[in-house]
Amino acid sequence: MAKLKILVIGKRNGILQWYENILDSNDQSADYVISGFALNHNNTLERFLKKIIPNKDVYTAKLLEKKLYSFQPDLILIVDLFYFSPSLIKVLSKYPCKKAHWIGDFFDQRLAKSKEIIDLFCFTDSSFMEDAKKIGITNSLYLPLAYNPNIFFEGNESKAERLLFIGAWSPNRQELIEQIPLPLTIYGKGWDKLKKADSIIHPYNIPLTQVANLYRKHKYILNLINKKNIRQGMNMRCFEAPACGCILVSEYVEDLELVFKIDEEIIYFSNPQELKSKLKETIINARLAKDKVHYHHTYKNRLKTLVELLLDSKISQ
């Protein structure tokens, strides 16, 4: 039987590298093959041309149509929040394959413009499904983020007890970190704004491979919600940290309970004082969360879910 074809449409070199992580889940043993199309640019020539041509949307739509014609996908998976131009919607509507749009940010009414061509909207925050209903989108699914096991895995390094946070600066994150009565090590662009005693601050972004290396050297990984993007969902850190054998120390959000046994597998807190006491008193077996994400929360798992939901008839042929 010929393998199914999945075309992933996304953005190259995004901060989260969501697009690249899904492409990296291509596996010779899987029932499908994956190819990618980046809406921003797929090579240096495209990148240059998009800086000088008068209508980038029309140019991108023509490139996408060429890719669809040559690859002939069974499933198109759009990752990240995109509001499609009329040119792109027209091209996507020509192809009868199944289409899913996986979204991890707050959205507005513009998303509804593509509802006639999308078979399934997937949201990383469970509350987004209600937001979608308000703009007429009912074909939706809660599909949390995941992690890339080729990058995030446990090593043999000894783990420091110091609390580590790696992530972008935001006002609500700074407000919370200022109140945490513990020294931290922090990496991320914008954190030069923070002045915190006994803390080590590296105010710049680092590549995912370095993030994973740091996780392997720390026991406790702090997770703070960026409220500019989500309401109660989980970010990639919720899966990447346990995958490295760390204990996830997360600000409480409701979606944590959809994945973890929060009293046994992670440390959660509702305020900074509770965080300090739980770090002292709570006994967590890091292997419980590590095994859970390993078996159930990779990008390969997410693709399997979508293939089973949208291409079940083709699998059984």
Labelled PLM ranges:
Residues A2-L63, K67, V79-S87, R110, ...:
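Nucleotide-sugar donor-binding catalytic core of glycosyltransferases
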Residues Q72-D74:
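Proline-aspartate-enriched helix->loop->beta-strand connector
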Residues V91-F106:
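Active-site proximal beta-strand in glycosyltransferases
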Residues G104, L145, A168, S270-N271:
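Active-site donor-binding loop signature of nucleotide-sugar glycosyltransferases
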Residues I262-P272, K278-I283:
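Conserved acidic donor-binding segment of nucleotide-sugar-dependent glycosyltransferases
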Residues K280-L310:
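A charged, aromatic-enriched C-terminal amphipathic alpha-helix characteristic of glycosyltransferases
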Residues L311-Q317:
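Generic C-terminal helix-cap and adjacent flexible tail
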